[in-house]
């Protein structure tokens, strides 16, 4: 399974970019033993359209053009579900991998959010809480959760989970 993070906008050099790169590199290294062949990041330039609806539609077209037909898709959106613990994310990723899905695409929208066509294509819509977060931070959180999910699948001690479970 190939992992792909598709994000609207480019992170400038700085701590968010460095931390996102660190989690991506960790995911690549650990993923090899789990059948994960890559963890790529594609940054799509923000639309320059005047109207928000036009910007979101243009960005959606660019996002969907990058999503393989057999891909599982997790869309990061503030209107998504925030009740999935890391173990559930790992379970879903492992299930998609074991079912032969060729790719997992994590989508991070732009400042105006995600178009309904992207939300409709998603297998799951994930929120990192009710607060609105900066896109750089969402990228770090998404990549950290990918890495954490892989550690759970590998039985790695990074994720300690619930000691009562």
Swiss-Prot record:
One of its GO terms (molecular function) is rRNA (pseudouridine-N3-)-methyltransferase activity. GO terms for cellular component: cytoplasm. InterPro entries: Alpha/beta_knot_MTases, RlmH-like, tRNA_m1G_MTases_N. It is an enzyme of class 2 (transferase). Keywords: Cytoplasm, Methyltransferase, rRNA processing, S-adenosyl-L-methionine, Transferase. The keyword S-adenosyl-L-methionine applies. CDD domains: RlmH-like (cd18081). Its main location: cytoplasm. Belongs to the RNA methyltransferase RlmH family. Specifically methylates the pseudouridine at position 1915 (m3Psi1915) in 23S rRNA. Homodimer. This is Ribosomal RNA large subunit methyltransferase H. It comes from Methylorubrum populi (strain ATCC BAA-705 / NCIMB 13946 / BJ001) (Methylobacterium populi). The gene is rlmH.
